Amino acid sequence: MTTPEQRNRTRERYAYFRATKPILMVDFWNDGCLTQGCIAGGRKYFHVNARGDVEPCVFCHFASDNVKEKSLVEALNSPLFREFRSRQPFSENLFRNCPLIDHPEQGKEIALKFARYFTHEGAEEFFTELFPAIDAYSKAYGEIAEAAWKERMKRQDDKPLPAGKKVVGKHG
């Protein structure tokens, strides 16, 4: 996992390359400005793993349903997915859009209250043994991201758009 400083540098470099090169680059962690926050939980994206478990995101290894037992419509309307979507965006600062690494307390609460099972061996360790380190990471990156977000908001031509508006121009 990148350090908070490396993550910020990645965000800056992606913005530079998008502005200067004819290339499509996508970064789940840092592209909240392009998508108005996290796209997971069925808002614009979800993941079905090889066993058929319907996960909010490829990085969220917990589920309530399996496509072998329920339809996608039923899975996407489960309490897990409804709760996930109800909390989006997880922050007004769209540089901090992930419920796992930017707001781990929210990811933990969603997983432990609304998921029926973990989808990978050891996945629960993210919310137990690894949680203190992830929480510390989130706080350290949060300081960097807050400063970057305040700077972004100062730019008159780059205000956040209401949900549903098309994003055009600089994105970083």
Feature-to-residue mapping (PLM):
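Short glycine- and hydrophobic/aromatic-rich loop-to-beta-strand nucleating segment
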Residues: 46-47, 103
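Flexible mid-to-C-terminal extensions adjoining Fe-S/redox cofactors in radical SAM and related proteins
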Residues: 59-172
